[in-house]
Amino acid sequence: MCDKNGCGDNPYKHRSSPDYYGTGLKVDTTKPFTVITQFPAKDGVLQAIVRKYVQDGVVIENARKEIIMDQEFCSAQAGAEMYSKLGGHKGMGDALARGMVLALSIWWDESGAMQWLDGSESGSGPCNATEGFPKAIQQIEKAPTVTFSQIKWGEIGSTFAGSNSTMRRWNA
C-alpha cells in the first residue's frame, strides 16, 4: 500500500524554526551538507526518527530537538492518518527490520511548485506560490543539479564524526 503523505518533519512547519535552514542560516543551503537520518529502537521497537546535519565538519542537531518525531508526533499531524493505519512507527520499524532499498529521486513539480515542501501557503516555508515551478527555477538557474554522494549506512552514530547527544535518551 502507498502512504503518500506519511509522517513528515519540517523545521519550519513542525518545529517553529523558520531560521533553521536556508541561505546563510544554521544549515546554510548555499553550501554542501550531509543529512543524517537515524531510526533508534529500544528492544527492537522503533522509538523515533531523528534527523541531523553535518556542514563544514560540524554536527548540527535538528531544530528544537526536544520535539521528538515519534508515534505521538505523527498521530498529531493532519494527513498522517494512513501512516498510523498502516502501523505507524511500529510498522515502519518492522519494515526496517525486514530490510529496505534506498531510492533517491528529484521532484520536478510542474503542478504544485513544491508548495508541500517549502511553500508559505502550506506553512512549510517562505517560498511564494510560483517560485517553485520548474520554469521559474530555470530563470534563475539554467541547469539545476543535485549531487548525492558518500551514502553510508550503519549502526547509529557510526557513519559520521561528532557528538551523538540525541541518542542518549533512547539508551535508558
Language-model region placement:
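Aromatic sugar-binding interfaces of carbohydrate-active proteins
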Residues: 2-15, 27-34, 40-171
